[in-house]
Amino acid sequence: MKIIKFKKKEKFKYKRKVIINDLILNIFVGIHNFEKKKKQRVKFNVEILTNPYVFPNNKDLKSIINYEEIVYKIEKLSNLKHHELLEDLSENIFNMLFQNKLVKKVNLKIEKIDIIKKTKSVGIEVSKSKI
């Protein structure tokens, strides 16, 4: 006789995410000549969904997504070169974020704040997830 073990039913469904709201950086971005000569204010909003079943461990920072490190990396990446398009910048940010195995999905919104009069901002919003 074969004994079948049933999986223990979970009591909760977890969803974990790291959020970075309204990170404002002065960077070179855009296709126009005036955008290539002067930095402009760009706002970043990032939502990173992580593996909900990797539980945070106070003694191991690799068990979490460190938002301070993410802010630093976005700033460094954004200032590395002139980005012609926000779409190009967003792909570079996605590539950097998905190097962390804990990252499952990223929602990224990048906005130029002062570029078009009569608007608060213009920009892009993109979601990308691992398959």
Where are these regions (language model features)?
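N-terminal, polar/charged subdomain of small-to-medium soluble alpha/beta proteins
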Residues: 1-131
